[in-house]
């Protein structure tokens, strides 16, 4: 009897894993709807409870951290927002690389928050790093490169 239960469990395990991924994706969609409806407490509640594995779906994880960070910003909880933006940036850098424009944008977002919190050195480091990668990717005349130069100029002044 134990063998039969063991066999049933392991034969269903891939299906359970697939259902879990689908369920978590649905919860991500719900979290985004809460964000659009400005229900930031529920965004944070769902983002905190999601069981997403960074290595399985880095894009989904990055989105969760992004919306979580934005919700914390809207609620003016900047320390938690910094943590979430930093996590999003680190994941994008690790799994997607600097070739992805979203990685540069995540670095910029983190810099903006550092700047807002008067953490000038951290902000400058983010802006300069993002600028360097943006110039390599799209040249110094790109719109993003120009925006990053403006951020650097403002923080330096």
Features from the language model and the residues they span:
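Intrinsic-disorder-linked linear interaction elements in eukaryotic regulatory proteins
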Residues: 1-157
